[in-house]
Design a protein with these regions (language model features):
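Extended terminal and domain-junction accessory segments
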Residues: 1-162, 215-219, 227-244
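Beta-strand secondary-structure signal
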Residues: 130, 164-166, 209-211
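Extracytoplasmic beta-sandwich strand-turn segments characteristic of Greek-key/jelly-roll folds
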Residues: 151-156, 181-217, 244
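Asparagine-centered strand-capping/turn motif at beta-strand->loop junctions
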Residues: 167-171
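Short beta-strand/loop motifs in extracellular/secreted proteins, especially
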Residues: 173-177
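Acidic helix/loop microenvironments that form the catalytic cleft of cell-wall polysaccharide enzymes
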Residues: 180, 226
Length: 244
């Protein structure tokens, strides 16, 4: 036992009941939307395939984290590397996770994290990029927007810009998403700055957003930190470039 001095021992606590992983835990209680090629590409078209509509943003982004219908990128439609899509999603920042709910103990979650400093940048994001975490479990294929790394164009950021990244997890697995070189400023359910991170955990079926300041020129890796998912294609190159 871990103790303050040799010879001390504490009683072994009774283990929690073995949790059951259900379809609901994987955000597919209705079995998800199988068959991504059923006309679900939505209105952003090819622009969504390369990282979102990129529309200009104005003012506060209140209510951004609330559950809402999902618009899937066109690159997911009819894609043999995408075996399911999420239904309405939300951030679920206060969810402890499988086996940790309702056990009589307090479990820390993202909702408990609060930065000791204000938003380090202070600007509203000038544009928004939405990326879907996608895959095909039987083929062990992983990707962003249904496009594996080998086939994907870089995500291009203008040096000095502030943007919002929205991630939607269409899969039944967790994906901790890490952007090299730049900070990820997680937003709360109302779209306000909450805490600075360098990896954003994405449970199944969640939609979470964070702000990025493109303040480091260069070519940066952007990937799932489950490295076998990265090797399977869930990776992009991010290029921070001087404005033309």
């Amino acid at each position: 036992a871990l103790a303050v001095q040799p010879g001390l021992a504490a009683p072994v606590p009774v283990p929690d009941p073995r949790p059951l992983l259900t379809m609901e835990d994987m955000a597919h209680g209705d079995h998800g939307s199988h068959g991504a090629g059923k006309g679900m590409e939505g209105g952003c078209g090819a622009m969504m395939a390369e990282g979102g509509c990129g529309a200009a943003m104005h003012g506060a982004h209140a209510g951004h984290g609330a559950a809402k219908p999902v618009v899937h990128p066109a690159s997911e439609a009819g894609n043999p590397l995408v075996d399911m899509q999420s239904s309405p999603t939300g951030p679920r920042l206060d969810d402890p996770g499988v086996g940790l709910r309702g056990n009589g103990r307090r479990v820390l979650t993202y909702a408990d994290l609060r930065s000791l400093f204000d938003d380090p940048d202070g600007r509203d994001p000038g544009r928004e990029v939405e990326l879907h975490l996608t895959g095909h479990m039987e083929k062990f294929a992983w990707s962003f927007n249904g496009i594996p790394f080998a086939s994907a164009e870089p995500l291009r950021l203008n040096y000095g810009e502030r943007l919002r990244v929205v991630l939607v997890n269409d899969t039944m697995m967790h994906h901790p998403i890490h952007l090299h070189g730049l900070w990820s400023d997680l937003e709360d359910a109302d779209g306000a700055f909450q805490v600075r991170k360098h990896t954003i955990d994405m449970p199944p079926g969640t939609r979470r957003s964070y702000r990025v300041r493109a303040d480091a020129l260069g070519r940066w890796a952007y990937h799932c930190h489950l490295l076998y998912h990265m090797e399977g294609g869930m990776m992009r190159e991010v290029r921070v470039e001087e404005r033309a």
